[in-house]
Structure formats: C-alpha cells, structure tokens
From Swiss-Prot:
Name this polypeptide is given: Osteocalcin
Disulfide bond residue pairs: none
Positions contributing to Ca(2+) 3 binding: 18
Spans traversing the lipid bilayer: none
Purpose of the protein: The carboxylated form is one of the main organic components of the bone matrix, which constitutes 1-2% of the total bone protein. The carboxylated form binds strongly to apatite and calcium.
Amino acid sequence: AAAELSLVQLESLREVCEQ
C-alpha cells in the first residue's frame, strides 16, 4: 500500500511540474 501511495504522490508532483 505504501509503495502505491508513493507512486500516486510522484504522479501528482509530475503533473504539478508540467503545469
């Protein structure tokens, strides 16, 4: 579960960087 949460957080950060 922790690993999945980390992946989700990384995706969110990527979206923020793209904006």
